[in-house]
Amino acid sequence: MRGKKRIGLLFLLIAVVVGGGGLLLAQKVLHKTSDTAFCLSCHSMSKPFEEYQGTVHFSNQKGIRAECADCHIPKSGMDYLFAKLKASKDIYHEFVSGKIDSDDKFEAHRQEMAETVWKELKATDSATCRSCHSFDAMDIASQSESAQKMHNKAQKDSETCIDCHKGIAHFPPEIKMDDNAAHELESQAATSVTNGAHIYPFKTSHIGELATVNPGTDLTVVDASGKQPIVLLQGYQMQGSENTLYLAAGQRLALATLSEEGIKALTVNGEWQADEYGNQWRQASLQGALTDPALADRKPLWQYAEKLDDTYCAGCHAPIAADHYTVNAWPSIAKGMGARTSMSENELDILTRYFQYNAKDITEKQ
């Protein structure tokens, strides 16, 4: 009986030693396969590593470096184990499928890989980001004005880091709008109009030789009998910039640019009046033949703008509501952000106008 007990204790001791040794070995393996050197042992990781070397996460004045695991692997718990298990697919694609074994293949799958990481970070409330950064530790008052606005908004709306901070350690995917969206917009142009109807250009258009009209501008049809409708354009002139008609006094949303003939053809509807900054404004209107097709409603144009926003802007940050900024603030903000995308000049113009027409100081949203 004693012999059996001793054998049982011996087996138990062996099991404890083997189990403990196995756990220590597993921990060692998990730790070793999480360091940057191991990540770089895969050829396909050389490209993202080069991108990462040009960022503040690799080199900065504080001398603090975020390694691969700091961003891509949760620190502990089941999230850590799941991340390690899911990483087995990377080994498969490296050595078996060859899915990203060339620069061309890597670029072809960049968006897919980026969206996978963004989704994982979103699901964990950007846990790996918050292991270094936290709102509690931030001196928000010392940040730039734009950073203060966005961080205060993020706290208020319970947004997470990855909602805005995409493409900060590796190049973001280059996203392009489907051309079908633009063709669909053009197909919705009004085929016939009636007197008194409101129509809206969906691209840069012309009132004869008098004016170049911007997308989204409200035009009233005054004579629909001819091949080209005669339209009425109403707006405001600013002294010193008489060749431009704006939406309202003090609001620099340009409706149209006038030629010399257009300026002469203007009907002035009031005297010059000063705004709060001393700029002089007056109402004016222009009539002429619209030579380009237009929409019967702004809705399709704004739906197209929202697609642009979702395609190009949401890849880097959470959507910013149009009423977050004023009509005069939006152009410089949109231009600065648009420069980081592959948006065309026309696409950026339409998106900017969508933001302006729905800005926080526009009383009646367009």
From Swiss-Prot:
Topology of this chain in the membrane: Single-pass type II membrane protein
Location in the cell: Cell inner membrane
Protein residues bound to heme 3: C129, C132, H133
Record-linked SUPFAM superfamilies: Multiheme cytochromes (SSF48695)
Side of membrane Periplasmic, spans: 28-366
Cytoplasmic membrane side: 1-6
GO process annotations (BP): anaerobic electron transport chain; anaerobic respiration
Positions with a binding annotation for heme 2: C68, C71, H72
Protein name: Cytochrome c-type protein TorY
